[in-house]
Amino acid sequence: MENLIRFRDTSGFVHLIPEEILRLEGDGSYTQVFLINGRKVLLSKTISHLLGLMPDGTLLRISKSHAINPVYLERIFLRSRQRYVCLASGEKLEISRRKACEMRKQSKKP
């Protein structure tokens, strides 16, 4: 059985499968959920709250306002001025300075 997470949105309740989430985009108290089928869901929850409900390793926080599903990660660029990820959907998202340092350290571990 797949893990279903149930949320209330503007039109009622929505059931999400964490593995089908492409990325999250937070804006204050709201979070836009982008699914792999192209659907978008707006929730009145913070990105931190949603990340707390997800199984470990499902989503990776790359900045204050973005989290991605590492399954759909195609490329990571960690140069001094250019820090971003490219997703399978073709989207390009900036990585924060602090998260870039964490990602560098993780990539150097054996």
What are these regions (language model features)?
Residues M1-P110:
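Basic, polyanion-interacting recognition surfaces, primarily
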